């Protein structure tokens, strides 16, 4: 399965009538492997800062998580495994795998829990596959 198919079929799938706003799979080096059409244009530095937070949990807390034009307040995640952010009625979940980061962005009516489930389910699958 192509990386784009993982984004289209597993991240942008319908959950209880709702979808993520956008999603992507990004390499640890910050290079985007696949993304949905609405995924924000991001800088490599933004992705490498996210990666740094996995290596140094709490790195993003003072400044927030920036992705494209949006700044997310970093909230409780799983150190070294999952980063979660909040912005108004929406937010972001990032799951680290062996080779990539799975990123999901949501807004109401999708809930944080639904976003976490979609992103972490694919991330766990990729980890099981050695990816």
UniProtKB/Swiss-Prot annotation:
The modification Phosphothreonine is found at residue 111. One of its GO terms (biological process) is nuclear migration. GO terms for molecular function: actin monomer binding; proline-rich region binding. Gene3D superfamilies: Dynein light chain 2a, cytoplasmic. The keyword Amino-acid biosynthesis does not apply. SUPFAM superfamilies: Profilin (actin-binding protein). Keywords: Actin-binding, Allergen, Cytoplasm, Cytoskeleton, Disulfide bond, Phosphoprotein. Disulfide bonds join 13-115. Its main location: cytoplasm. It holds the Pfam family Profilin. This is Profilin-11. It comes from Zea mays.
């Amino acid at each position: 399965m192509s990386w784009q198919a993982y984004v289209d079929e597993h991240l942008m799938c319908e959950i209880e009538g709702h979808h993520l706003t956008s999603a992507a799979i990004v390499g640890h080096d910050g290079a985007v492997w696949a993304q949905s059409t609405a995924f924000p244009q991001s800088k490599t530095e933004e992705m490498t800062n996210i990666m740094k937070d996995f290596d140094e949990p709490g790195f993003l807390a003072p400044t927030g998580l920036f992705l494209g034009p949006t700044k997310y307040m970093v909230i409780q995640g799983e150190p070294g495994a999952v980063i979660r952010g909040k912005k108004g009625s929406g937010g972001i979940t990032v799951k680290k795998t062996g080779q990539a980061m799975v990123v999901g962005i949501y807004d109401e009516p999708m809930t944080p829990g639904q976003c976490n489930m979609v992103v972490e389910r694919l991330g766990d699958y990729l980890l099981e596959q050695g990816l």
